[in-house]
């Protein structure tokens, strides 16, 4: 790899980490600062959510019932304009200070040449999400 390639991968990984930190902070606008206007969120097996404003609404709808969120990063690695995350997404729905939902997730992020997230795909067990209190992800 070249120095330019290493710099780009590090920048892209930093953008994804900043996006996920926005989740930990429950800060929709911090998340949105890392994405393009035409971003696409694909949450298997649901329909794709297209456009920054629609993704903003989806994230806000998930934040609303959550008292605390933590996306625990297990692995993050990049290649070119792609970043993959292996995570444990943890959710406290009732403010008890304990995690009612611990969800293993793999996320795939595609970034533009200037380091903005343009596509975000998530892979996890949707039944586990629903069983432990996850809100509907349909707009």
Task: Give names to the regions the model predicted.
Residues 41-60:
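Short solvent-exposed beta->alpha transition segments
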Residues 1-34, 138-139:
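Short, low-complexity N-terminal intrinsically disordered segments enriched in polar/charged residues
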Residues 2-11, 56-139:
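A beta-strand edge to alpha-helix "cap/lid" segment located at domain peripheries
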Residues 20, 47, 75-77:
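Structured beta->alpha junctions
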Residues 31, 47, 99-101:
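Short, surface-exposed helix-loop/turn micro-motifs enriched in polar/charged residues
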């Amino acid at each position: 790899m070249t120095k330019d390639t290493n710099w780009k991968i590090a920048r892209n990984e930093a953008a994804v980490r900043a996006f996920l930190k926005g989740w930990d902070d429950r800060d929709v606008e911090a998340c949105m600062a890392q994405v393009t206007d035409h971003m696409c969120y694909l949450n298997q097996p649901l329909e794709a959510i297209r456009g920054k404003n629609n993704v903003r609404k989806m994230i806000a709808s998930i934040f609303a019932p959550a008292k605390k969120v933590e996306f625990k990063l297990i692995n993050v690695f990049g290649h070119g304009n792609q970043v993959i995350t292996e995570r444990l997404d943890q959710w406290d729905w009732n403010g008890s200070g304990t995690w009612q939902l611990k969800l293993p997730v793999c996320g795939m992020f595609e970034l533009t040449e200037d380091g903005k997230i343009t596509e975000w795909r998530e892979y996890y067990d949707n039944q586990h999400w629903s069983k432990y209190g996850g809100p509907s992800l349909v707009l």
